[in-house]
Amino acid sequence: MTQETITTDVVIVGAGPCGLFAVFELGLLDMKCHLVDILDKPGGQCAELYPEKPIYDIPALPVVSGHELTERLMEQAAPFGPQYHYNEMVEEVQKLEDGRWRVKTDGGLVFEAKVVVIAAGGGSFQPKKPPIPGIEAYEGKSVFYAVKRMETFRGKNVLISGGGDSALDWTINLHPIVQSMQLIHRRDGFRAAPDSVNKMHALVEEKKMQFHLGQITSLHGDNGQLEGVTVKGNDGADYQIECDTLLPFFGLTMKLGPIANWGINLHENLIPVDTEKFQTSEPGLFAIGDINTYPGKLKLILSGFHEAALMAQAAFRYANPDAKLTFQYTTSSTSLQKKLGVA
């Protein structure tokens, strides 16, 4: 059976914060959006990897979780009726003779749109796993590479391994609810915010947690339940650490996947864009958020919001070259307020 083609103004690849806010900005310009995401829910990396981790640099929100931010963005986009397609990976993006784009997914969906916006974060992320023999047997049971629900770890004896921001942040955020908290790193220098490092050292001094120097060489347990680990200390001696949960945080590996085959210019697995339109090397194909690169780029959610606003203006002009675009403010425009359902 032939899949019916879905016709729309815009296809957004990625339903993370930048993709969701792009719906709002495009909606103000009467552009209808379909979003496609490989995950089974909205929020992208923000919701998948750290849904309960506090975010502190969203304007007007002193602190917000990834989950709450996603919910608010969904609510903000709702008046424009976006359509979401989860568990779908965009495999092919092809420009048609009439200037529109044909987008195909691995699940058989076919779209035709005037504009395509790539808001796929860094592509798909996979955790870098430590080279510990047999760790696969514990994964998802007592070894976890991300904290999706803090309550999962309440009352546990947790060992966190790593020296970056994720390791330090979760050491600090989880310690109030766990039975015991231990952190292990191969050296006493950290690749994390100095404030987080200071907080961790303070917890150690207050005997609220322990810090170890060394590397984990083996795991001990039964039927996927961890009971402890063997560590080779920096002095070369082996010793044991008792724990029932291990959180290794060694960073993420980014994979572009099919994006690399879409015929657009790439630079170090990122998509170069201009900072006026956030357009790629292909007219009508835009990129916002962590997937793009330009001089002075900051990989921040708030930067992606700015990019979405400018992209939307350029996307409208590309899709409607003969239309007049009058800039309006939501605070004073009755027509925009009607679209938002507040007038």
Swiss-Prot record:
Cofactor(s) this protein requires: FAD
EC number, as in UniProt: 1.18.1.2
Keywords: FAD, Flavoprotein, NADP, Oxidoreductase
Gene Ontology molecular-function annotations: ferredoxin-NADP+ reductase activity; flavin adenine dinucleotide binding; NADP binding
Record carries keyword Cell membrane: no
Xref: Gene3D superfamilies: FAD/NAD(P)-binding domain
Keyword NADP: yes
Positions contributing to FAD binding: 18, 37, 45, 50, 90, 125, 290, 331
InterPro entries referenced in this protein's UniProt entry, alphabetically: FAD/NAD-bd_sf (IPR036188), FAD/NAD-binding_dom (IPR023753), Fd--NADP_Rdtase_type_2 (IPR022890), Ferredoxin-NADP_redctase_2 (IPR050097)
Reactions listed under catalytic activity: 2 reduced [2Fe-2S]-[ferredoxin] + NADP(+) + H(+) = 2 oxidized [2Fe-2S]-[ferredoxin] + NADPH
Cofactor-binding details, from the entry: Binds 1 FAD per subunit.
Subunit-structure text: Homodimer.
Family to which this protein belongs: Belongs to the ferredoxin--NADP reductase type 2 family.
Entry protein name: Ferredoxin--NADP reductase
Species this chain originates from: Parvibaculum lavamentivorans (strain DS-1 / DSM 13023 / NCIMB 13966)
